[in-house]
Amino acid sequence: MPKEVIERYRNSVPEEVIQIWEEYGLGSFLNGYLRVINPDDYKELVEETYFSGKESIPLFTTAFADVITWENNKYIGIIFYREEDFDIMASGIKYFFYDIYNEREFTDDYFDLKLYEKAVKKYGELEYNQSFCFFHY
């Protein structure tokens, strides 16, 4: 993660996010399903497509092109672009990370990990800047 990005968002995102950026930079976790992103790469998209976009900071994306945001300096939100929906996932980053690794119901509610595993098996692992997408005929 570029140092200027870290400094720009240092007082706007949780310290845990700053630590991830400083220690690991860009990358993925949850077997590649979630990606750590540069907020600047998604800020314009979120501002133009999400009613709360100007107050939201993009933090992560999913393998299905959903965007996870930091909202109102206290919530983790998710924008489900393929479903044209959004939700608040957690009240704080600590709860978000705890729930990802400890609450099956949480991941079932917000992430389609089974579909992701099937897609990876059929099409292979994604590159960092790729997502699985759905086409309506």
Pin down the residues of each PLM region.
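Low-complexity intrinsically disordered segments
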Residues: M1, F111-Y137
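A surface-exposed partner-binding patch
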Residues: M1-I78, Q130-Y137
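Context-gated lysine
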Residues: K3, K43, K54, K74, ...
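Generic surface-pattern signal
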Residues: E7, N11, E22, L26, ...
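A sequence-composition feature that detects small, non-aromatic residues
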Residues: A63-A65, A90, A119
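Compact, glycine/acidic-enriched structural inserts
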Residues: G77-L115
